[in-house]
Amino acid sequence: MPAHSLAMSSPALPAFLLCSTLLVIKMYVVAIITGQVRLRKKAFANPEDALRHGGPQYCRSDPDVERCLRAHRNDMETIYPFLFLGFVYSFLGPNPFVAWMHFLVFLLGRVVHTVAYLGKLRAPIRSVTYTLAQLPCASMALQILWEAARHL
């Protein structure tokens, strides 16, 4: 599909696609970081991986690996709903600037949240960025519900 077709189907769609793709890449980066931390700390989840990297004693948990896994799980709990909400919201005909702000606030909130989580930054940075990123999701969800209810 040519790029101009994306904009014609919904002026907000290109912004959504850009932010969504960046968020998916960010999730891949967290997964890669998790793997690197496992290797550095010699803390493997599977016995066969531990055997390959030194022996069965390395099939163990590690606080830093667990932190990475929690960050990744938190991404899944927030980014997957955003992908649905943002896609549907894009087709409601929102003001393109307002849509951009929804998508950008979520993206920046999630990036800072990940940096705060993995970097062990002091409270309340992580919880503030988590909440900030949830505001556009709540806004989009309410607008979707409103539009759906209007057409019942």
Curated annotation (Swiss-Prot):
UniProt cross-references to InterPro entries, sorted A to Z: MAPEG-like_dom_sf (IPR023352), Membr-assoc_MAPEG (IPR001129), MGST1-like (IPR040162)
Catalytic activities: prostaglandin H2 = prostaglandin E2; 2-glyceryl-prostaglandin H2 = 2-glyceryl-prostaglandin E2; prostaglandin G2 = (15S)-15-hydroperoxy-prostaglandin E2; 1-chloro-2,4-dinitrobenzene + glutathione = 2,4-dinitrophenyl-S-glutathione + chloride + H(+)
Gene Ontology BP terms: prostaglandin biosynthetic process; regulation of inflammatory response
Cofactor(s) annotated in UniProt: glutathione
Residues spanning the membrane: 13-41, 61-90, 96-119, 124-152
Main location per the UniProt record: membrane
Membrane topology qualifier: Multi-pass membrane protein
Cytoplasmic side: 42-60, 120-123
Pfam families: MAPEG
EC number of this enzyme: 5.3.99.3, 1.11.1.-, 2.5.1.18
Lumenal side: 1-12, 91-95
Keyword flag Glycosyltransferase: no
Subcellular location: Membrane; Cytoplasm, Perinuclear region
GO MF term list: glutathione binding; glutathione peroxidase activity; glutathione transferase activity; prostaglandin-E synthase activity
Binding site for glutathione: 38, 73-77, 113, 117, 126-130
Site (Essential for protaglandin-E synthase activity): 49, 126
SUPFAM superfamilies: MAPEG domain-like
GO cellular component, one term: perinuclear region of cytoplasm
Keywords: Cytoplasm, Fatty acid biosynthesis, Fatty acid metabolism, Isomerase, Lipid biosynthesis, Lipid metabolism, Membrane, Oxidoreductase, Prostaglandin biosynthesis, Prostaglandin metabolism, Transferase, Transmembrane, Transmembrane helix
Pathway assigned in UniProt: Lipid metabolism; prostaglandin biosynthesis
Family: Belongs to the MAPEG family.
Assembly: Homotrimer.
Function: Terminal enzyme of the cyclooxygenase (COX)-2-mediated prostaglandin E2 (PGE2) biosynthetic pathway. Catalyzes the glutathione-dependent oxidoreduction of prostaglandin endoperoxide H2 (PGH2) to prostaglandin E2 (PGE2) in response to inflammatory stimuli. Plays a key role in inflammation response, fever and pain. Also catalyzes the oxidoreduction of endocannabinoids into prostaglandin glycerol esters and PGG2 into 15-hydroperoxy-PGE2.
Name of the protein: Prostaglandin E synthase
Organism encoding this protein: Macaca fascicularis
